[in-house]
C-alpha cells in the first residue's frame, strides 16, 4: 500500500518506520529543505529520535510528489501546521484516499479540533489516531495500544487493518470529539504535573492533579458533545497517564522547568521542540468560558504560564476552592 507520511518529526519518523516494517511503500515528506538534504545524505534523523531510516522509505521535499497516488495520507505535523498542510493537500490527493491525523491540539485562532480544520479543505474520510504513544517507544517496537476515531467506521477499520501488528494495537471508536479532546487537553494537565514535580511536590499531588484534571477534561468534553466514557479509554486516561509521568513528555518536562523558576520562553527554548500544551492551554481556557464549564486547573496553569502567577499561589488557590462533590458537573 502506498502511504504518504507528512512530517519527519518524532511521530512522523516513528510511524514511517513502523509502516515500512509492515511492507507498505512509505513516502516521508518534510518541509525543511535542510532536514531533507541531511536525511538524503545520511539516512539518519539526528534531531528527532536519533534513528536511521531504512533505504526503502522514500524521502520527499516536494509535497505533490509525496502524496501522488497515495492510498493513505498521514498528517504528522504539529497542530499549528495542520491548516497549512491541509490547504496544500486540497486537490492533490485521490478522492478515495484516507487521511489519518496524528496531531493533538486545538487551533488557537478558530478553537477547532484538528479533524475540523482538515475537513475545511478535504472531502476525504478523516481518521484520528490518538492514545498513549510516545514515538521513542513506538520506533523501538515497544508494545503500544492506541485508538482510531472517525465518523466513517469502514475507514477506521481499514486503517486498523493496515497499521496494526503484534507491537502496535489499535481500537476503533466513533466518538471523534472525545478522542480529539482527550489527546489535546491532557497536555495541559501534563504541564501541571511537571510544574508540581518542579516545585518538589510528591505522588499525592500528581495523582490529585491527574484525577481532577480528567474530571475537568470530561466536563468540557460532555459540554462539547462527547461521550464521557471515551475519557476512561486510551485517548483519555491512557494518554493522560503516560504524558503526566514519562520523561519523554515534552509537556511534563516544560512544566518541570517552569516549576523550578524558568519563564515559559526559557523553558520552551530548553526543550527545543514543540510543546503542544502551551497553545492548547489558551484554547481550552477560552472554550471553558464559551461553554461555561469549570476548569480550575486549566485556569491556574493559564495564569502561571501566561500571566506569571506564582505556582505556589496557584496551588493554594486550587486547594482552598469552595467545597465540591467529587462528580460535580459530570
UniProtKB/Swiss-Prot annotation:
Q: What is the name attached to this protein's record?
A: Glycerol-3-phosphate dehydrogenase [NAD(P)+]
Entry function: Catalyzes the reduction of the glycolytic intermediate dihydroxyacetone phosphate (DHAP) to sn-glycerol 3-phosphate (G3P), the key precursor for phospholipid synthesis.
Q: Which residues cross the membrane?
A: none
Reactions mediated catalytically: sn-glycerol 3-phosphate + NAD(+) = dihydroxyacetone phosphate + NADH + H(+); sn-glycerol 3-phosphate + NADP(+) = dihydroxyacetone phosphate + NADPH + H(+)
Q: Name the species this protein comes from.
A: Caldanaerobacter subterraneus subsp. tengcongensis (strain DSM 15242 / JCM 11007 / NBRC 100824 / MB4)
Give GO cellular component annotations, separated by semicolons. Answer: cytosol
Where is the protein situated, by its record's location annotation?
A: Cytoplasm
Q: Which NCBIfam families match?
A: PRK00094.1-2 (NF000940), PRK00094.1-3 (NF000941), PRK00094.1-4 (NF000942)
Q: Name one GO biological process term.
A: glycerol-3-phosphate catabolic process
> What residues make up the catalytic site?
186 (proton acceptor)
Q: In which pathway does it act?
A: Membrane lipid metabolism; glycerophospholipid metabolism
Origin superkingdom: Bacteria
The gene it comes from is: gpsA
Give the enzyme's EC designation: 1.1.1.94
Q: Where does NADPH bind?
A: 10-11, 31, 104, 135, 250, 274, 276
UniProt keyword annotations, A-Z: Cytoplasm, Lipid biosynthesis, Lipid metabolism, NAD, NADP, Nucleotide-binding, Oxidoreductase, Phospholipid biosynthesis, Phospholipid metabolism
